[in-house]
Design a protein with these regions (language model features):
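Non-catalytic pre-domain segments flanking phosphatase-related domains
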Residues: 1-14, 181, 232-235, 239
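Active-site neighborhood of HAD-like aspartate-dependent phosphohydrolases
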Residues: 2-51, 56, 65
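Helix-loop "lid/cap" segments that line or gate small-molecule binding pockets
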Residues: 61-75, 165-168
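Metal-dependent phosphoesterase signature
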Residues: 68-109, 117-118
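Conserved Lys-Pro-Asp/Glu-containing loop-to-beta segment of HAD-superfamily phosphomonoesterases
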Residues: 161-192
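Acidic, Mg2+-coordinating phosphoryl-transfer loop and its flanking beta/alpha structural elements
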Residues: 184-222
Length: 239
């Protein structure tokens, strides 16, 4: 599919956890239950000490691999992964009770403004499995802003996801987005590094676990402590 030039339009790719919302420890607890059931793997403080619970910017399959592969081996990891992810999604759905999902400051107003702008195509760029992403976005009603995206269920490699999102944007809108017409919005160093490696723009926000100083060191095109100032955030995204 050839598509037309984006001509001043923007494809804005949003991360979920730490950027759009927080679901507390729900996803972590769901992962732990899943790994206990599917691999017999149990959490110990040593895993925390070795940094294995830094999930920021990673895909769900990558998270499972990093947690268990050293202890269960590559063959058992691969064999058990489909069931582990299935159990994770079941646990996630069970634990996402009312009040567990909290939108980040300013994000609802920002999404409304972006969605109303005819220059903007919104999509997701997330390490979440697609079903997991939709489960998290349902409580605040954010699914309506994101008709498509690229997910951890498309590839375990985060850096392979933006081209998938661009191709889906072409199918959805008929526009071919490239270079600086693509904007990655996220809260992790991986979001910024991903944007830089692909030659697209990145807008970082320090509403996740990564400090503003750490994000700034990666050289995003714009950096915010939060999106509470929606006018500034909007301008930075669509410039």
């Amino acid at each position: 599919m050839q598509g037309t030039s984006s001509n001043g339009h923007r494809l804005v790719l949003f991360d979920i956890d730490g950027t759009l919302l927080s679901a507390g420890r729900v996803a972590r607890d769901a992962i732990l239950r899943s790994l206990k059931t599917s691999y017999g793997w149990s959490y110990t403080p040593d895993h925390e000490d070795r940094g294995k619970f830094d999930f920021s910017g990673k895909t769900d399959p990558q998270i499972v691999r990093e947690l268990v592969v050293e202890e269960v081996g590559a063959e058992r990891f691969e064999a058990g992964l489909p069931r582990a992810l299935e159990i994770y999604l079941e646990e996630l759905e069970r634990q996402l009770l009312p009040g567990t999902v909290v939108p980040k400051p300013g994000i609802e107003t920002l999404l409304e403004r972006l969605a109303a702008d005819p220059r903007v195509t919104l999509a997701l760029l997330t390490g979440n499995l697609e079903r997991g992403a939709r489960l998290k976005l349902e409580p605040p009603g954010f699914n309506r802003y994101f008709p498509f995206g690229a997910f951890g269920s498309d590839s375990a490699d985060r850096y392979q996801l933006p081209p998938i999102a661009v191709e889906r944007a072409l199918a959805h809108s008929g526009k071919r987005f490239e270079g600086k017409s693509v904007v990655i919005v996220g809260d992790s160093v991986h979001d910024v590094a991903c944007g830089r490696s692909l030659g697209v723009r990145s807008v970082a926000v320090a509403t996740g676990i990564t400090s503003p100083e750490r994000l700034a060191a990666e050289g995003p095109d714009a950096l915010f402590d939060s999106f509470a100032d929606t006018d500034r955030a909007f301008d930075a995204i669509v410039e």
